[in-house]
A protein has these predicted regions:
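PRPP-associated nucleotide enzymes
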Residues: 1-342
């Protein structure tokens, strides 16, 4: 009887394991904040699901009001919100959305933040400077985020500001694809880093394309103001492709483009993951001699493209959608570091 009981227990536990194994993973729900609804819609279209119902509004005193319009109990929730536009309002909205889902018993809440806010404030560059990127990381965790998906962090060490998993996706595979398909003379190209901080990213792209790379070294005096620039590398009669993770007022890349043409480059392109384009950026690009300024849609670009015909956009919704699908199914995301999903 004793052996029989053991045998029954063994069989019974394997039956239970079998049942647990067959039981479906919790369903996925994707919600969009108000910063970039267009990108969120593209992501869910690729996943073949609907956007979750949510009402986002402001009270008359300008406090953010969030109403999640459907049950998220036991669900795997993804909230898409980029750090652009009204950055502080959008960040607050994201924190409240995360918290609303968390206290409504979502099994896991992932913040999908294509362009991470405050990413440039990642170190003390002068006395008494705040490290705001770390503060944002703390706020996301306290709000209840279990996981972060972002793209081309300004400094990849920001991943270490979190105690939760962070997937820092790369636009690089999509950028390589764009270069090969849209710059006929790319084999005669040279990939240029507009500053030393970007050199690692740029050498990786140059290696993948099997072309040379150049570097522009700049000395800054004040924030958002560029001073002297020194070009290291031979660009004469070559197609120069400037690559950077973000451009804000575009002083650096426009200055760099002039420097490259002075040095004899035949054409100049700029490829940027996050096109913030604030202040005088658009007029600077219009006046600079770029063949094209190529950005991804981690930030809404429709208005910028209307104002500036040189701006072109690479859609990265398929990368974010595939990252969500793989995360939901418990698959590895590292495939996306070197491939563009179809």
């Amino acid at each position: 009887g004793w052996e029989g009981a053991l045998c029954y227990a063994a069989n019974h536990s394997s039956d239970e394991q079998e049942l647990a194994f067959r039981r479906k993973m919790p369903n996925v729900k994707v919600f969009s904040g108000s910063s970039h609804c267009d990108l969120a819609q593209k992501v869910v279209d690729r996943l073949g699901i609907e956007l979750g119902k949510v009402v986002l509004k402001k009270f008359s005193n300008q406090e953010t009001c969030v109403e999640i319009g459907e049950s998220v109990r036991g669900e795997d929730v993804y909230i898409i919100q980029s750090g652009c536009g009204e950055v502080n309002d959008n960040l607050m909205e994201l924190l409240i959305m995360i918290n609303a889902c968390k206290i409504a018993s979502a099994s896991r809440v992932t913040a999908v933040i294509p362009c991470f806010p405050y990413a440039r404030q990642d170190k003390k560059d002068k006395s008494r400077a705040p490290i705001s990127a770390k503060l944002v990381a703390n706020m996301l965790s306290v709000a209840g985020a279990d996981h972060i998906i972002t793209m081309d962090l300004h400094a990849s060490q920001i991943q270490g500001f979190f105690d939760i998993p962070v997937d820092n996706l790369y636009a690089e595979p999509a950028v390589l694809k764009w270069i090969r398909e849209n710059i006929p003379e790319w084999r005669n190209g040279i990939i240029v880093s507009p500053d030393a901080g970007c050199a690692k990213r740029v050498t990786a792209i140059a290696d993948r394309l099997n072309v040379e790379f150049a570097l522009i070294h700049k000395e800054r005096k004040k924030a958002n103001e560029v001073d002297s620039m020194v070009l290291v590398g031979e660009v004469k009669d070559r197609v120069a492709i400037l690559v950077d993770d973000m451009a804000d007022t575009c002083g650096t890349i426009c200055h760099a483009a002039g420097k490259l043409l002075e040095a004899g480059a035949s054409k100049v392109y700029a490829i940027l993951t996050h096109g913030i384009f604030s202040g005088p950026a658009i007029s600077r690009i219009n006046n600079a001699c770029f063949e094209a300024v190529v950005v991804t849609n981690t930030i809404p670009q429709d208005q910028h493209m209307k104002e500036c015909p040189k701006i072109q956009c690479i859609d990265v919704s398929m990368i974010l959608a595939e990252a969500i699908r793989r995360t939901h199914n418990g698959e590895s995301v590292s495939y996306l570091f070197s491939h563009v999903p179809m």
